[in-house]
Amino acid sequence: MNRAEILEAAKRCVCGEREGEYGTPERNFDTIARLWTVYLNARVPDNGFRGTLLVTPKDVAMMMALLKVARISVSDKADSFVDLAGYAACGGEIAIGEGVAVDE
């Protein structure tokens, strides 16, 4: 696969297949963020933060991307690169929706 094919495969996943299965990234990542927040605060009560640790949908996108980076570090599978591109796109869309400036 070349880079264009990887990006096209990621587009098919995040704009079609996966969205049909799991809903929009914003909604799905919000659900994951809420679950991770509860889990992490219960698991690591003295987390060094003031108050409750809050995981956001953008954090979910970045942590899922890091999971793919970890997998790529031990096994080069095209699917992991496709997923990495997809998580980056979803994270970018969420960030822009939150008001991050867009370079044009």
Label the model's feature ranges.
Residues M1-E104:
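Intrinsically disordered, low-complexity regulatory regions
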